[in-house]
């Protein structure tokens, strides 16, 4: 068995990635989220595949086909709610994974980090297009509002929007192409994940101390396979409680009303995992400025390696930057709350303040606190 594991050209790759992989001996549970994201991706692809067998991407029948899945298909309700809530679990794991990367300075592994940002954009695009498919009120108006943002691009904007729509409004052509893209993107994401892992295994994992762990490595199996399995059990437990007891807790009631182009919902808002970016978009009165801020809210992650001023990699022994980091987390929670609120006083000013704080913390405060800590510890 050992011979096959180490010699067979295909099994050898799996062996070097998940069995004999040298891993730091001190990585905490914050390093579990990579495997949990892999599990989420598998769940989403499998449930999505079964949904696609019964779904019809036509404006006249899309809403009815989803109702048919829930009412008439064997365990269709379970597959549908697993897919919808699986997206939420995916994003919870994603945000924790990125948050871990920022806290422990994992962004210094540039290729892995940049690949992760591309993955984040790809997953967000997939989730957005998936939200359009049930063809409820929020699906239709969400698609209209978000795609319409592209019209802010100078000169080519309007043409670009009509090209994406396949007409002069969100209609049958838009739904069909969104279904096609929503189907293909997870497989592209799977390929990108493999590249992400390839880059990670070039350098090896980071660790909570932020020190070189080459002198103290342990095999991935059995230590981290067992540890990851515990994480998997906890995730599945939380996932099934959410899916079976509170299936609609994270959804929007407006999406149980079929899409009607003549009737606008009182508050157009995306799924909860986009609310922070949506709040940043809305906090800028100018359309183009809002779109740029929206893109930058994610793209700013790519600047993090260049904004790292500290001589230490992680925040483990850096109390000043630690405090600023947790203020950033609180700020993101405030933005998420504001994104779901109507555009009126006092939410407008809170959203604008939180948006300014978000960029200020990342671009100005964290680099400055890094330099202050270097001075305090005489690390210059």
UniProtKB/Swiss-Prot annotation:
> Which annotated residues bind heme b b562?
83, 182
Q: Which Gene3D superfamilies match?
A: Cytochrome Bc1 Complex, Chain C (1.20.810.10)
Q: What does this protein need as cofactor?
A: heme b
Task: Cite the binding residues for a ubiquinone.
Answer: 201
| Cellular compartment(s) | Mitochondrion inner membrane
Q: Which UniProt keywords apply?
A: Electron transport, Heme, Iron, Membrane, Metal-binding, Mitochondrion, Mitochondrion inner membrane, Respiratory chain, Transmembrane, Transmembrane helix, Transport, Ubiquinone
Which residues are listed as membrane-spanning? 33-53, 77-98, 113-133, 178-198, 226-246, 288-308, 320-340, 347-367
How does the cofactor attach, per the note? Answer: Binds 2 heme b groups non-covalently.
**Where along this sequence does the record place binding of heme b b566?**
97, 196
Q: Single GO molecular-function term?
A: ubiquinol-cytochrome-c reductase activity
Major localization listed first in the record, in broad terms: mitochondrion
Any GO BP annotation: mitochondrial electron transport, ubiquinol to cytochrome c
GO annotations of cellular component type: mitochondrial inner membrane; respiratory chain complex III
Q: Cross-referenced Pfam families, in alphabetical order?
A: Cytochrom_B_C (PF00032), Cytochrome_B (PF00033)
Membrane topology term reads: Multi-pass membrane protein
Top-rank taxon of the source lineage equals: Eukaryota
Report the family membership: Belongs to the cytochrome b family.
Q: What does this protein do?
A: Component of the ubiquinol-cytochrome c reductase complex (complex III or cytochrome b-c1 complex) that is part of the mitochondrial respiratory chain. The b-c1 complex mediates electron transfer from ubiquinol to cytochrome c. Contributes to the generation of a proton gradient across the mitochondrial membrane that is then used for ATP synthesis.
Q: How does it assemble?
A: The cytochrome bc1 complex contains 11 subunits: 3 respiratory subunits (MT-CYB, CYC1 and UQCRFS1), 2 core proteins (UQCRC1 and UQCRC2) and 6 low-molecular weight proteins (UQCRH/QCR6, UQCRB/QCR7, UQCRQ/QCR8, UQCR10/QCR9, UQCR11/QCR10 and a cleavage product of UQCRFS1). This cytochrome bc1 complex then forms a dimer.
* Additional information: Heme 1 (or BL or b562) is low-potential and absorbs at about 562 nm, and heme 2 (or BH or b566) is high-potential and absorbs at about 566 nm.
What protein name applies here?
Answer: Cytochrome b
Taxonomic lineage of the native organism: Eukaryota, Metazoa, Chordata, Craniata, Vertebrata
